Amino acid sequence: VNQCVIKTEKGFDLIGSNIDVADTEINLYSKFSREFILREKLEGIDYDYVVIDSSPNLSMMTINGLMATDLALVPLEPHIFAIKGISALMNTLNLVKRANKGLRHKFFITKFDARINAFKELEAELRESLKDDVLKTKIRIDNAVRTSQNEFKTIFEMKNSKCIEDYENLGEEVKACLKN
């Protein structure tokens, strides 16, 4: 893990994804106890927080991420497909929780546009069905996110981004969850 770490100026380290991740996914299937490999690699690593950004599909890499974490943060876009996919996702989380007893989960709403009434209605529906599992913070839709990705910058390096405050609030809310 230490060989892959990229130091940043902002006081956090990254391990970026690349084309080799596809090979890693394939190679995991032939390994014994493959769902625990990431957890084992992270043991003894001295960080306050480790954030694992997984793909939304249920791959072996995603399972490894869920097995290695204490808190799964699940972004939900306020549209009908998110609502329809929640039961399948909950089934997956419950299966993983059999092996990772300490796993908790929280959802947060992302790509939210308050100008669209359907988004507000779907947000209410998500909050009603998931109750306290949905964090209060919503991440507003912001073109600066796409621009930052294209420029290989963090959102915090983008001027005039309206979602910087959203992400800061989300970070505080997540830290509070981790303390409980």
Describe the predicted segments one by one.
Residues 62-79:
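Inter-motif core of Ras-like GTPase G domains
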Residues 1-46, 149-153:
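P-loop/Walker-type NTP enzyme "switch/lid" segment
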Residues 32, 90-105, 111:
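P-loop/Walker A phosphate-binding loop and immediately adjacent motor/lid segment at beta-alpha junctions
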Residues 19, 38-65:
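Switch II (G3) loop of P-loop NTPases
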